[in-house]
A protein has these predicted regions:
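Short, acidic, metal-binding catalytic loop of nucleotide-sugar glycosyltransferases
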Residues: 23-33
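Short aromatic/hydrophobic "clamp" motif used to bind/position activated sugar donors
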Residues: 86
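Conserved donor NDP-sugar-binding/catalytic core segment of glycosyltransferases
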Residues: 98-130
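Acidic donor-binding loop at a coil-to-helix junction in glycosyltransferase catalytic cores
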Residues: 169-177
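Boundary detector for helix-to-coil junctions that initiate low-complexity/charged tails
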Residues: 211-288
Length: 288
């Protein structure tokens, strides 16, 4: 399991936070960590450029490309990664030891497992624990509950063809990636402990993603491999509307047994309070 993990960090103008991210990696470094790859996605901020130069001098692999978006930046880093397992980390977050200490063991133990993910701790403009549910495809089809910071086999990335670099809007790459991995039969395993720290800050895409729901739903679920999931999602939403209408007409108490049955069958719907966005990126929209 030594030298099995490649950490890939897309970076755009967040040099101050990037130092903190790197420090968190060094603080939990284990023999499983093979390399740290930083992909500069066309940064223009002088501080960030200076930080990147310093990291390069410290023997980190720094790749540079014109601003093409977070999906392209991740793909560029993963493409050259030598590790069997990939851990994408946003350049304003911090990781904990669990991913490097326990993740590779789980993946080595069971070849059918493609993705290992865990809970997160919010910091910055929000605090508290983000408790991620056990994996359930119906729940994932309804709404994303997995951040990009999850350990997965490089073979998963190869199998799905990488992150979509042509999203009409940024911030949805993770959900699309996880769905395409799931429909190909890869198993997801949940570590029930905090595996990384998730920064909530002004100016991130945390509050922007949901504005593009309709456009992105149409784009993602028109993909050939996701059409069936799109039909499932539409039916789930239709049933939800029926449930809400019946609750209005009959009262919530009468429908408690029905809601309990739906929860048992589908794993329950993802609530906004669990995690308010589908995913988020620290890379700006690319100007075409």
């Amino acid at each position: 399991m030594q030298n099995s993990v490649s950490i890939v960090i897309p970076s755009y103008n967040l040099g101050t936070f990037l130092r903190e991210t790197i420090a968190s990696i060094e603080a939990v470094r284990t023999p499983s960590l093979r390399e740290v790859i930083i992909v500069d996605d066309g940064s223009t901020d002088p501080t960030t450029l200076e930080v990147l130069k310093d990291l390069e001098k410290s023997q980190y692999l720094v790749m540079r490309q014109p601003n093409r978006g977070v999906g392209a930046a991740r793909n560029a880093g993963i493409r050259v990664a030598q590790g069997e397992f990939i851990l994408p980390v946003d350049s304003d977050n911090r990781i904990r030891r669990t991913y490097l200490a326990e993740g590779p063991t789980l993946l080595h133990r069971d070849q059918s497992v493609g993705v290992v993910y865990g809970d997160a701790e919010y910091f910055g403009e929000r605090t508290g624990r983000w408790r991620v549910p056990q994996f359930d495809l119906v729940r994932l089809v309804d709404a994303n509950f997995l951040d990009t910071c999850a350990l997965f086999r490089k073979r998963v990335w190869e199998d799905v063809g990488g992150y979509d670099e042509h999203m009409p809007h940024l911030g949805w790459e993770d959900w699309d990636f996880w769905l395409r991995a799931a429909v190909r039969g890869w198993r997801f395993v949940h570590l029930q402990e905090v595996t990384f720290d998730y920064r909530v800050r002004a100016g991130s895409m945390l509050t922007e993603v949901n504005r593009h729901n309709a456009v992105m739903d149409s784009y993602m679920f028109s993909k050939k491999e996701l059409v069936a999931l799109g039909e499932m999602r539409a039916e789930l939403h239709r049933l939800l509307m029926v449930e809400q209408t019946m609750e209005y007409r009959l009262g919530r108490g009468l429908l408690k047994p029905i809601r309990a049955m739906m929860t048992m069958v589908g794993g329950g719907r993802t609530r906004a309070k669990e995690h308010p966005v589908r995913s988020r990126s620290t890379t700006p929209t690319v100007q075409k």
